[in-house]
Curated annotation (Swiss-Prot):
Subcellular location: Secreted
UniProt gene name: ublA
Protein name (record): Bacteriocin uberolysin
Record-level GO BP terms: defense response to bacterium; killing of cells of another organism
Secreted found in the keyword field: yes
Organism for this UniProt entry: Streptococcus uberis
Keywords noted in UniProt: Antibiotic, Antimicrobial, Bacteriocin, Secreted
Keyword Secreted carried by entry: yes
Length: 76
């Protein structure tokens, strides 16, 4: 977790931006997953790694939100 915080600080990711991303995932996670699946199919698997990593991020954030840890999801 510390390395993620250091990386966020180094790259200049503001907590406001992170909160907006978490809110977007909270509201539209299913749409994000469907879009990533469609993009993988259309690209004949070329976007498979990107799709898998995006799905992992979405599932991790949704897991934090489901456990009422929205602030921790923003930090992550």
């Amino acid at each position: 977790m510390d390395i993620l915080l250091e990386l966020a600080g180094y790259t200049g990711i503001a907590s406001g931006t992170a909160k907006k991303v978490v809110d977007a995932i909270d509201k539209g996670a299913a749409a994000f997953v469907i879009i990533s699946i469609i993009s993988t199919v259309i690209s004949a698997g070329a976007l498979g790694a990107v799709s898998a990593s995006a799905d992992f991020i979405i599932l991790t954030v949704k897991n934090y939100i489901s456990r009422n840890l929205k602030a921790q999801a923003v930090i992550w």
